[in-house]
Amino acid sequence: MKNIYWVSGLVLPFCSLQILKAEKQSNIIFIITDQQRGDALGCSGNERIITPNIDALAHDGYYFSNAYSATPSSTPARAGLLTGMTPWHHGMLGYGNVAEHYRYELPQMLSDCGYLTLGIGKMHWKPQNALHGFDATILDESGRVESPYFMSDYRKWFQTVALGKDPDETGIGWNDHAAATYKLNENLHPTVWTADVAVRTIEHYEGEKPLFLKISFARPHSPYDPPKRLLDKYQDIEMEAPIHSDWSKDIGADLTDPKADPTAAFAQFDDEYVKNSKKHYYAAITFIDEQVGRIVKALKDKGLYDNSIICFTSDHGDMMGDHHHWRKTYAYEGSSAIPYIVKFPKTLKTVKPVGTVVENPVELRDFLPTFVELAGGNVPADIDGKSLVTLVRDSLPQWRKWIDMEHATCYSEDNYWCALTDGKIKYIWFVHTGEEQLFDLVNDPKEMKDVSKERKYKKQIKDLRAAMVQHLSERGDGWVKDGKLVVRKKSMLYSPNYPQK
């Protein structure tokens, strides 16, 4: 039997099987954005950005200051979130297609624990209407159409309420570095639509089963197109100039005119142009922040806030012109560091007070074991992620030393790398060339100076190189031979662990 709820003009089927009583398990509200830098929140220490609602969530929970995306582009990052696995173990080493099915899938595992599992917004899976264990999804796929038979639910809705209008009227592409304000009524914007569906879902939630609700915003990924009223809030806020460094001084030097290549991955644009794009980007995040406020209010009005697990994160960051790089796929902080906030239910006993900043290195893979543990399920021993509960509940938590990161070739032949970081120091190995970089993030959080050749850091780079050898050794002689890292001339997009049909 199915109950039918009307959500933002769309029909959503909700399974109504009663497996477990909802009051015995906490609801899980998982909010994820697309391409949001880790420093693009007020609670990160950024005084230029306006995010009061997300900051309030951090005040009620925990802000994880050293959070990373292991493979910082959309699809492999989302595969890690879905499976709780490292890139090598879920199989995606760069930007490719999420597999149709995995042995471990977060929505299915929570469904097995008795949860109603619903996904709203951008999933970025293939096929695009795949469920991966969700009872239902309502999709906004940002204009991506990978089949002539697919149209996202947002686009269907847009056609019914804005007949004759163009949802892409702003005229900026999905990978453009330019920016402009949204040209239509802001209630037509996908950011509002995603929140509308989420709020109505919460309002109609009957509590027969505990709820896992994934709310996935397609912004602030380009197009950077906030409403003008929010851009106006930044009128008197001077944006920080893009980061320039000696090691990146020649990158993108052949391209200085933004109009010459609207989607350039490397360019040396004028600082004012970059600052304008960043201002729109920040305003787009403030737009999302407003929607987070609406979602939190709906939870409070329904009496669900206190006993819910509420998370806020992103799949990866956006370089925004730092070191003359744009978008993602890089090991540098702008691309790989992500926002990461968890508000646990009040019933969870913790040793760390709420509002604490947690410095242990965490990654998207850690959400799966966290949710499964709190849902009362069994976390498989071979899951790579670690439950975040350990970090707030235990006085002396056992935790990993490093986060491993990597990305197969993308945007340029030499952008093929593996990295290790704990948020304090970062080692990068360029797989095609054998070159190395080392950044002291404590003293140089903007990665201005590559210290890999400095005598002072000789021991650190030796130790990190050895740690990388250990990390990659399971991959065989093509990666590590005779205890040394192997330079690879051919990029590998999928590991042997990628599920075959």
Task: Give the ranges of each region predicted by the language model.
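Formylglycine-dependent sulfatase
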Residues: 2-4, 8, 20-430, 435-436, ...
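Core hydrophobic alpha-helical transmembrane segments of single-pass membrane proteins
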Residues: 10-12
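C-terminal segment of classical bacterial N-terminal signal peptides
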Residues: 14-19
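Extracellular C-type lectin-like domains
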Residues: 439
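Residues forming the ATP-binding cleft of Hanks-type serine/threonine protein kinase domains
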Residues: 442
